[in-house]
Each structure stands twice: as C-alpha cells, then as structure tokens.
C-alpha cells in the first residue's frame, strides 16, 4: 500500500496530498474572482452546486458544519452603529463599577452567625457590551405599537442589570445596598426571580439550561398566538443570553431542532463564550465555539460568530497566506484562557510566536498594544453589527457565538482566572485598578467606602440613557402582573353532563370526565378560543383524539400530506391555525409550552388557559425544575396527571406507576393539587380553578390526577361544592346500626376511596361496625389549611384558637380514623396533627416500587385494599378498647392476609 493510499484510507480526518498544486491554485483563484466580482452569495451557490454534483457522482463528501475561526461578518459588511459609542462606553463603565460595588459591599457584611451573601462580578464584566447594544438599540418595551421583546437574561449577570436600573432611576441606592437581602422587603433577588421581584423580572433563568429551553417554546408560542389571530406578535423577538458552559445542560440544546423546524426567526440566542465555567475551562482541549457552531448549523440555525475585535482587522487583512487564521484555529480554549490570564509579552511569545510570519506581523506593536487586542464581544461596534444582522434575519432562528473574557476589566484579581466566578471580595488596590481601568471619577479618599456612582440627571450620559429607552418604548426588564382583559367563566351548571350521575349501567373514568369538561369549555364563545390543550403524544391514551378534527393540531406549515386516517371522523388534522399543541414524546417541551401559555397574561397581555395532560409519573418527577420555575413565574393553568395511582395504572410497571406526584406537587407553594374520585369533583375543582385563575387573576396553578379506571359516578350532592374545594366532605353516611355499635371514619381519595365503600360494607356485614366514608380530594389542601391555623395560633396565643377544617369536620364524629390512598403514606400522614386530639389515626399507602399486575393483586400487594382497610379499622377500635385484639386477628385470618409477606416498601 502506498503512503498516499494509506492516508486516504484513514478516513476524513486525514488530508490527501496535493498532487497538483497549480490546479488547486487555479480553482481557488477562480473562487476568489467570483467572490470579488459577484459576491459571497453567488460563490456559495456555486459551491453548493459542485458539492451536489459530486454527491450525484457517488463521491463520498464529508460534511462539516464549521467555518473558520474568524468573524462571520466581514468588516466591509458591518452595519455602522448609529449611537454615540463614546457615551455608551462611559455608561457601561458606570454600570460595571456599580455592579462590582454591589457585590463587594454585600460580602463585607459579617453577621454574628457568619456566612457570605455571594454574588458574581465576572459574568456581567464579560458581556456588558452586549447588554449595552441591546438596551440602547434593539430591545423594545411593551407599548402601544409593540408587544415588547422578551429577554431571558443569564442569571449570573443580575448585578449588571440592577446597576443599569439604578442609573435609570428604577432602583434606589438602598435597594442596591440590600442586594441578596430580601427578607425585609427592600432587597434585590440573587438572580432573575419574578416571584421575588414581580414587576421587574419576567423569566427565571436559573437553574441553568431552563432559560434556553423555555425561550424556544416561548418564541413558538408567540407564533401560535399570531397564527390563531389572538395577538399580533410578528415584530416581537425573544432574546436569550446563555453561557457557553451552560450549553452542557441537556435542556439547553434539547429543543434547538424544533426552533429550526418551525422557522422561529423571532428567536435569537446569544451565547457568551468566555470559555470558562465555574471550575475551569469549558473545553480546555477543544474549541467550544466551533462545537456549538456545528450543533446549531447542523440543526438548521443561522450562525453568526463574533470572535475578534477591530484591533484584529488589520492583522487579518495582512494575513495573505492564512498563517494567522491557522494559529487562531490551532490554539485550543485552554490556550486562549491562558493568554488573557497573563500579559502582552506572553501573548507575543505563545500566540504570535508559533509562526515566524505571525511574529513578524506584530513586530511594530508594543506588548501593551498586543494585550489590548480585544475579543469580539468587547467591541461595541462589532457587537452592534452582529445584533443587527441577527435581528433582521428571516426564516431561521439565529445564534450569536460571541467570544469574550470572563472577568473583563478585573485585572490580576480575576480576568481569565479559574477563580473568577467565585471572586466577590476585592481589596482597595484591586478596586483602584478597576476604577482606573474604566475611568470612574471617584477619588482615593472614597475607595474604602466603595460608593456607587451616578452622574447628574442633566449630564449627556444620563440624557442619552433615557432617550434611548424612550425611543424603544420604555424600560426593561419589566413585568406585567395582570392582563388588561377580563373574562367571565361559564356557570358551573354549564358542565351538567359532568356533574350529573352516570346513567344506570354506564361507567366512565375521571379522565373521560375531564375530556367532557374540556370539550364543553371549548364551546364557550369567549373563553373557548383561549384554551390551549397540550399533549405529549398521549391523546389516544386519554381519549382526546376527538379534538384532532374539532380544533386541529397547530403546525405552522399546515398539513402537506394526506393523513392515513383521513376517511375517519377523528382523523389526525394538522392546521396552521390549530389549537392543540402536540409536542410528541417530550415532557420537557410540553411543560415549556404550558409555561409559555400559563404566563401569557404577563408576557402577551392575553389570558390563555392551558391544559397539559400527561402520564402523572412523568410530571413533577421528570420536569420538577420546570414546575418550580413555573411557580416562580406565577403561572396560571391546569396540569393533569393522567393514569395516576400506583395500583390503578395496572399493567405498566415500576417506572409508570405514580404514588408520589402529590407529595412533589405540595412542595410548590402556589400549586393547588387534587386527587378526585368522581366526575363531579373534577368539574367542581376545575371550575374553581377557572374562577381563580381567569376571573380573579390569582397567581396559582392547579394539578389534578386523573384515573383510567371506569366506574359509576354518583353525581354532585348540592351544597358540597365548597367542601370539595377545601379537600374533604362526607360522601357516604354510616349505615343505621343498633345504638352503641362501634363507629369508624374512613377517608380516601382517587380510586382507593371506592375500596373504602367496599370496606364500609364488610365492616357492617362481618363485624357490626358503622363506618362513615369521607372523600378527601386534597390531603395537600387540608394540610395547608391546618398549618395555617397552627401558625395563627402560635402567633396569637392570647386569642381564641382557630380550628383546622379537618378537626372541624371530624370533631362531630366518633371512632378511629383510617385514611387510604393510592399514594405513599406520607400523603395522608400530613393531616395527622389536625386530627382531633385523642383520636386514633391509621394511614394506608403505596410505599415502594410499582410493578405490573392486575389492580386487585397490586392493591393486595401494597396493603391498601378493602380487607386491609377493615383490618386497620378494627385495629384502631382495639387500640381504643372498643373491641378485643382477637377481632383483628380473626379478620386477618378471615380475609386470608399473609402476615409473613415482605413489606411492600422493600419488595
């Protein structure tokens, strides 16, 4: 085998030997001539034609989504910034100073219990130029003529945003002094949190990775609103700021294919490529910018790289033989970090010194001049040009890969250092160096006090600051807390078909009840169009396929094929104005769409009512971080956990059977959760949710678990509506037994409440015990009510004690209390403190891993069926001294309970 053959056989990683350099030169010269005379677009077309011809000729063409390690926009193609860059530079300097001062001041506190408040200086320092360009020239606030651009701001840069708002007069010095000190109501939150600063921050972007994911679905939802004629969103943009290290979060890149597929040209990602994450380099041995370029371009995005500032323009223009470009590509990110952590002499030797030709290029430059060769993200003009190109691009989402230095301007204390992310304490000399670097007019005598700096209102800088925001409609970030519009929710009687008993011999599930409720709501002329059904490829599972034809599935491209089931009544209909959001097998996407719709009252001044239904096990457990973010964003809407209950979804097994989603739901303070048993409970609860979230615009969202088990529905008992909402009502009176017969109270929720009905019959027939059965649609709401009463009593010891709703209901009864649910024991255990004093309380639940089998077998395995309820009731009576313990043993034997079987918790 020849050397050349061996090299070619090694694959695409090898470069074949140039056997005819003159021919190669002629081809390259021809391409250069086309570029010079006819432009880059024509050259691109010709190259594509040649590649296609090669493929058609069966030549294996290796694909690369990468371009050279240079700026995408040529200097000659840069749009000139119309602003006053000198004034903008001074304003940025003041913001840098105030952001630094805020963090350093916060960490000078030394409370007796110790501890630092934290904060970050380095991140904002690296992208101040980008925020300057956006705030001064691109980002519109909501106004009469514009719905407002949406900004997902990188969490760690919050001090810089506060520093800007301080100059604008939106935040006071007292608030800056209380950075990360929020308890007394004067402080500023650590990161963007709408819950904590409801009129300021719109979107929480920490945990990292959630911002990019949510933003993609937010941009898609803007298109959805426009396509359905609900709001004009065509001139609005979604800008997303992320860190290059953040892109390793799987959520960051997980939905970029959707953005390209749906042509979300209203979406712009700005990835701050300072090459560092918290501990060290993002890709020390590689090039994160090239990696991300390949990811995004390969997914169909428009990619703009901004790597080098204007100081490099002349050097690149003189780089006729490509030596400089070659070194730029060869240096890895670890090298680039080292260059900025050292000095100009180091850069001369270790960067330019790699090739005699590049070393000669800079022989006329001093070490300081070499050091001041900036990266693209620190060049205001080039940032403006890149932003303008991104803002005007049509047909694709755009990503800006902007190279910066983490800790820019922090000097030896942090610039380019691995420790910069944690740097929050600066000494006086470091502060002086920072001041001098950015020409802040603060004398040495005040350095120790580290004052904030704000020019007088009549200075050119302050006038310019306000003029630019006035031209763009107002100040950002800003959050709307209520929509201007209002709706009246249809009366509860509208949902009569769900409230009434099922006809004799007819059985339905609570999932079917939900679908009936939703279908009726969709018919409401006012509110119906605002309903947003969200699916993750489970419509047929939940019996919702009838909605496909009725309201259509949203697809911006319509339906360009004939569906295989077109001849059927419920065919799969995609439509440009479709109402259903079908996310495929994608719970994170479904939740992100739900969040976009659930916060539309704030982001779009349009009240929307999202209903997202999914396998309950794949809800809070799978996307818990997004659910927490939804709480932070004050989301309003319905989450429906279908096929719920550890023993009710009988055949699916361990990963599908949910026994703890309500425990997780209760960790979110503004999540109101219910586990209804009956259709009428579903209707009453959902109607209450509509009243609270739509009519009264309360900042809550609802979680309901739904069942796939069919049974007869008893219908609403008039007068129990409020009790259902509170979480507990007597649904079946105890049978009339002789006076003095033992009494017990059976509590339950979901389908296991029906086991209590059967247990009631067994207790009467086999043991002469009178059992009352209570439906408890929400042990979580009962718990919150009880805890609220407890708290009030703790803080008002001299006033009459408040009584919890649980105690109020059970105080009128006698006998032990047995609660059984299809969830872990912890769910019903929560109300134990509120059970009347002296009463025995037993809890049955489904602790342990799920498994596949029939429902009856699973309920026996988890010890929650009617027989275990009877045994628990008798045990409670025995502990109360009402029946002998032998009765319990007798029941165990009668019902064939295996006392030696393994505890289901460990099975």
What label would you give each PLM region?
Residues 2-168, 434, 508-524, 528, ...:
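N-terminal amphipathic, basic-rich helices that act as targeting or association modules
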Residues 81-99, 103, 110, 124, ...:
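Non-catalytic terminal/interface segments that mediate subunit docking, oligomerization
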Residues 3-5, 184-204, 210, 224-235, ...:
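Thiamine diphosphate
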Residues 113-117, 129-138, 144-148, 199-203, ...:
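Short alpha-helical segments and helix-capping/turn motifs at coil-helix boundaries
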Residues 240-241, 247, 625-646, 651:
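A structural-propensity feature for long, helix-poor, extended segments
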Residues 240-241, 269, 534, 640, ...:
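Residue-level marker for buried hydrophobic side chains located in beta-strands
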Residues 82-95, 99-114, 120-262, 285-286, ...:
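Cofactor-binding active-site loop characterized by glycine-rich and histidine/acidic residues
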Residues 12-13, 30-33, 80-88, 107-119, ...:
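Glycine- and acidic
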């Amino acid at each position: 085998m020849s050397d050349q053959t061996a090299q070619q056989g090694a694959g695409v990683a090898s470069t074949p030997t140039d056997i005819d350099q003159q021919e190669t030169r002629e081809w390259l010269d021809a391409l250069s001539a086309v570029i010079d005379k006819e432009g880059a677009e024509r050259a691109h077309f010709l190259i594509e034609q040649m590649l296609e011809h090669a493929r058609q000729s069966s030549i294996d063409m290796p694909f690369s989504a990468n371009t050279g390690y240079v700026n995408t926009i040529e200097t000659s193609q840069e749009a000139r910034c119309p602003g006053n860059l000198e004034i903008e530079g001074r304003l940025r300097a003041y913001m840098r100073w105030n952001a630094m001062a805020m963090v350093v001041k916060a960490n000078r506190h030394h409370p007796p219990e110790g501890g630092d408040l934290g904060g970050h200086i380095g991140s904002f320092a690296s992208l101040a130029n980008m925020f300057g360009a956006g705030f001064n020239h691109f980002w519109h606030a909501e106004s009469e003529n514009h719905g407002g651009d949406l900004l997902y701001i990188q969490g760690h840069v919050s001090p810089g945003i506060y520093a800007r708002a301080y100059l604008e007069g939106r935040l006071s010095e007292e608030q800056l002094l209380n950075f990360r000190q929020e308890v007394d109501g004067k402080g500023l939150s650590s990161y963007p949190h709408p819950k904590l600063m409801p009129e300021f921050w719109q979107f929480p972007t920490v945990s990292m990775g959630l911002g990019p994911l949510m933003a993609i679905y937010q941009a898609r939802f803007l298109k959805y609103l426009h396509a359905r004629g609900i709001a004009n969103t065509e001139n609005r943009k979604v800008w997303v700021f992320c860190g290059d290290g953040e892109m390793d979060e799987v959520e960051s890149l997980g939905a970029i294919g959707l953005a390209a597929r749906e042509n979300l040209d209203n979406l712009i990602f700005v990835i701050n490529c300072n090459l560092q994450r918290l501990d060290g380099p993002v890709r020390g041995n590689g090039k994160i910018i090239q990696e991300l370029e390949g990811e995004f371009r390969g997914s169909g995005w428009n990619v703009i790289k901004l790597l080098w500032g204007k100081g490099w323009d002349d050097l690149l223009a003189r780089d006729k033989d490509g030596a400089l470009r070659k070194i730029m590509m060869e240096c890895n990110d670890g090298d680039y970090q080292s260059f900025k952590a050292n000095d100009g002499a180091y850069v001369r030797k270790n960067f330019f010194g790699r090739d005699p030709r590049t070393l000669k290029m800079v022989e006329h430059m001093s070490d300081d001049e070499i050091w001041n060769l900036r990266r693209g993200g620190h060049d205001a003009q080039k940032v403006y040009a890149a932003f303008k190109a991104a803002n005007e691009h049509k047909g694709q989402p755009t990503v800006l890969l902007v190279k910066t230095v983490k800790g820019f301007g922090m000097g030896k204390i942090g610039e380019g250092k691995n420790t910069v992310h944690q740097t929050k304490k600066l000494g006086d000399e470091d502060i002086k160096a920072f001041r001098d670097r950015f020409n802040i007019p603060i004398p040495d005598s005040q350095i120790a006090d580290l004052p904030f700096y704000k020019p007088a209102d009549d200075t050119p800088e302050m006038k310019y600051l306000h003029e630019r925001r006035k031209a763009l409609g107002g100040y950002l970030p800003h959050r709307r807390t209520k929509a201007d519009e209002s709706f009246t929710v249809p009366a509860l009687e509208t949902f009569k078909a769900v409230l009434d008993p099922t006809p004799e011999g007819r059985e339905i599930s609570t999932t079917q009840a939900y679908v009936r409720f939703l279908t009726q709501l969709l018919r409401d002329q006012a509110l119906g169009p605002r309903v947003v059904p969200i699916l993750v490829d489970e419509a047929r599972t939940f019996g919702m396929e009838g909605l496909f034809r009725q309201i259509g599935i949203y697809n911006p491209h319509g339906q360009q094929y004939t569906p295989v089931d077109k001849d059927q009544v419920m065919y799969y209909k995609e439509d440009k104005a479709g109402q259903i959001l079908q996310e495929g097998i994608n719970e994170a996407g479904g939740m992100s769409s739900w969040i976009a719709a659930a916060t539309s009252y704030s982001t779009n001044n349009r009240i929307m009512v999202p209903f997202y239904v999914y396998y309950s096990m794949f809800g809070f457990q799978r996307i818990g971080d997004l659910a927490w973010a939804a709480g932070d964003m004050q989301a309003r809407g319905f989450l429906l956990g279908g096929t719920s209950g550890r023993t009710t979804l009988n055949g699916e097994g361990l990963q599908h059977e949910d026994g703890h989603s309500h425990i997780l739901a209760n960790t979110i303070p503004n999540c109101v959760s219910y586990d209804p048993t009956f259709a009428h409970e579903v209707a009453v609860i959902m109607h209450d949710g509509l009243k609270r979230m739509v009519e009264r615009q309360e900042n809550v969202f609802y979680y309901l678990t739904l069942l796939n088990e069919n049974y007869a529905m008893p219908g609403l008992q008039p007068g129990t509506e409020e009790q259902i909402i509170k979480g507990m009502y007597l649904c079946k009176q105890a049978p009339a037994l002789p006076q003095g017969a033992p009494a017990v109270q059976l509590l339950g929720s979901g389908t296991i409440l029906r086991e209590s009905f059967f247990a009631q019959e067994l207790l009467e027939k086999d043991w002469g015990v009178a059992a009352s059965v209570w439906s408890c649609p929400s042990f979580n709401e009962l718990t919150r009510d009880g805890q609220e009463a407890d708290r009030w009593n703790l803080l008002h010891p001299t006033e009459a004690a408040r009584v919890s709703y649980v105690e109020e209901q059970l105080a009128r009864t006698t006998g032990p209390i047995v609660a059984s649910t299809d969830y872990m024991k912890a769910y019903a255990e929560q109300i134990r403190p509120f059970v009347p004093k002296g009463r025995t309380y037993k809890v049955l639940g489904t602790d342990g891993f799920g498994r596949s089998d029939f429902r009856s077998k699973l309920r026996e395995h988890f010890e929650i069926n009617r027989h275990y309820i009877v045994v628990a009731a008798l045990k409670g009576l025995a502990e109360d001294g009402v029946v002998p313990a032998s009765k319990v043993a007798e029941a165990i034997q009668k019902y064939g309970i295996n006392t030696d079987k393994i505890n289901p918790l460990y099975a």
